Amino acid sequence: MAKLSKVDIAILTVLRDDAKLTNEQIGQRVGRSGSAVSRRVAELEKDGTIAGYRAEIDAQQVGLLTVIFKLVNLHGHSRDLTDPFEAALQSWPNVIEWCRLEGHWDYLLKFLVTDTVQGDRLHDKLLALSMVKSAQGLRVLDKPRTKPLPLDGLGST
């Protein structure tokens, strides 16, 4: 984990809210020169704090109308099961997020699909994996709401 200064946090906050701004524009907002911002952004990219830049696409506008979360249990927790399971998830375009869990369930998956029929097909495909013991689905009823990363209060002087 990189040690972040107050200026780093200010730069990250501006980029989080609008990654299309120039270094000069960011500098105006954080009280630094464009070249100083450029150097700092390059360091934040190099150390992995800035993991990338991407467009935020509205899933519903491109026809991905249904969000489904899946809770999954595997037959065990060894790498012989988890590695091929995660490789399968990586190869499925409609699985956009997953994480391992502590507790009753082993994984939480997030699917974006065109409709419940496509969601049912993915559920069947999931259950066909030999390492999957069980899965339970939760269909989201309305558009998920997201908030930006909470950067307030982070960083040193």
Regions found by a protein language model. Name each.
Residues 1-157:
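A compositional/biophysical signature of low hydrophobicity enriched in polar/charged and small residues
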